[in-house]
């Protein structure tokens, strides 16, 4: 039992770090599952459920950190500020629609055909190269949108279209949306912030559907509940730290370091499994 709890701590740690950095949480979790297995009843169904729960822990961190900014009912806000918050939420919903529609239509097909190490490794490398290219291009371009409140509905839906690419494991939801935002002239910090906000309905919706599927097909024992709670808590706490750190980092640095990391990791993964 203790060993299984330690494994869930590791899973929560990986989720909390990789969900918000543009390096693909799904890709890292798929790789982790190849090396570390949880000893539970019906492991396949449980791992799907477990991944959902640790994602919800990560999402809760965004809600806590940005609660005032996201809360249109905050009594300390003026009428204009409340209107701005509602406007932000409408833009988030517009941005979520493309991936929600495509994800709903293709989710089962992608689970069956794309969730493997080859796809993960290739997408890690391709998006690593894309980040280096975009950051190089960005040096010669002026930032048009410096704050998340300046993002228009048109820009929101284009960022949402980029989020559709993240349906391929190894791409990174935050990586796809941040990359799209930068290409559209959004500052790194505003792009990262809007990416965090897009994650709330995107991940809650996807996680909610998988949660219901699991409950209709399986039951949870005491051990499973402890493992789920541990993973969720660790993911939440680590996400708090990572989100704060990333927002500080992007104000002074580019995403090039993440591009190099993706290329190196993707290459190592591809070589490892090809030589296995």
Regions found by a protein language model. Give the residues of each.
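Multi-pass membrane proteins that catalyze or facilitate reactions on polyprenyl-/lipid-phosphate substrates
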Residues: 1-276
């Amino acid at each position: 039992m203790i060993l299984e709890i330690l494994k869930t701590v590791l899973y929560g740690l990986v989720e909390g770090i990789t969900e918000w950095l543009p390096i693909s949480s799904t890709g890292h979790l798929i790789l982790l599952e190849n090396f570390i297995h949880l000893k539970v009843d019906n492991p396949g169904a449980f791992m799907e459920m477990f991944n959902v729960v640790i994602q919800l822990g990560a999402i809760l961190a965004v809600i806590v950190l940005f609660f005032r900014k996201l809360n249109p009912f905050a009594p300390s806000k003026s009428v204009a500020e409340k209107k701005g918050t509602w406007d932000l939420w409408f833009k988030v919903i517009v941005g979520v629609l493309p991936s929600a529609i495509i994800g709903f239509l293709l989710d089962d097909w992608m689970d069956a055909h794309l969730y493997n190490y080859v796809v993960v490794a290739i997408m890690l490398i391709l998006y690593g190269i894309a980040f280096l290219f975009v950051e190089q291009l960005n040096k010669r371009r002026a930032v048009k949108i410096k704050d998340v409140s300046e993002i228009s509905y048109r820009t929101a839906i284009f960022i949402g279209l980029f989020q559709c690419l993240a349906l391929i494991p190894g791409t990174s939801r935050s990586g796809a949306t941040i990359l799209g935002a930068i290409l559209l002239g959004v500052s790194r910090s505003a792009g990262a912030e809007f990416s965090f906000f897009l994650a709330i309905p995107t991940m809650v919706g996807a996680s909610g559907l998988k949660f219901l599927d699991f409950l209709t097909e399986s039951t949870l024992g005491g051990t499973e509940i402890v493992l789920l709670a541990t993973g969720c808590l660790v993911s939440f706490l680590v996400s708090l730290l990572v989100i704060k750190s990333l927002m500080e980092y992007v104000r002074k640095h580019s995403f090039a370091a993440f591009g190099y990391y993706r290329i190196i990791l993707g290459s190592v993964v591809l070589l490892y499994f090809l030589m296995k």
